[in-house]
């Protein structure tokens, strides 16, 4: 159940555990995670999906227009595989021209030689790259009814378990990212339905988080489905208000034989809430990695959100963009882009795998090289 006494705002103590990586939350558990995973092997999976919520005007900046958000997940992973887009309509970027955080993911998996796999949990546009199909579907606008059918939810959960088991046969830890435009709103809806305090807690892909739009849409959704905050368990809250990434990732965690690094920001809160409800929330086994832009975001509060759920470990990654020669990267420093495609967690995974040999300067240099290749092709 939500811990109301842990909902206060404010950034807690941060401790640098690796170059460019700081830990928050349970610092003792964080040190154990670093010790256990340092030098270990990993594979990164990016779970892609879509929700009709992303097409609500003003709710997501993960695309130049609301309609283009359906193309963003495919474009993100195509860029990581091929340095160009194929099935997507355009290079994923927000309306002010900042590049997709896929550039960070691409750079750090290159630097650390981390295998990268795409998992389709229900993307509207399928990517032109190899991917594992979990048989999902685009999440419905929860103001019009449950986001996912029982059949789809159950299939994503069970297939996720099988996948998690197979992916961790020969690695030391698993890294799981996501690309779901509109996902902070579905996450907010799930957490509200579970009874958590969510007002101004969730980050956004836009510079000025559209809290009023998100809160209005969530309120309309709960009213349409006759749900009061705290009415639902995690299963029903995710099925009725979530997106296809959520049951897929829960399943992957349950199937995993190793610790799991959740590469994402506030969108990972429903995953932690599900585990907490089942008595399975262990910060040494499941921990979160995100960018410093989420942790330091003045328009959201990931820490107070996670504190309500229970004990947690949160790693904050700095890609060094303040020193970039490209304006698009410096826009991250101004809050125009914060997270996506597992960017922050991917950097954490790279730092863990290499025992801290990859620094923010290395990340920035590789990001700029990747970005230049992308721009040469468009």
From Swiss-Prot:
One of its GO terms (molecular function) is nicotinate-nucleotide-dimethylbenzimidazole phosphoribosyltransferase activity. It holds the Pfam family DBI_PRT. Gene3D superfamilies: 3.40.50.10210. InterPro entries: Nict_dMeBzImd_PRibTrfase (IPR003200), Nict_dMeBzImd_PRibTrfase_arc (IPR002805), Nict_dMeBzImd_PRibTrfase_sf (IPR036087). PANTHER family: PTHR38811, UPF0284 PROTEIN SLL1500 (PTHR38811:SF1). Belongs to the UPF0284 family. This is UPF0284 protein MK0224. It comes from Methanopyrus kandleri (strain AV19 / DSM 6324 / JCM 9639 / NBRC 100938). The lineage of its organism: Archaea, Methanobacteriati, Methanobacteriota, Methanomada group, Methanopyri.
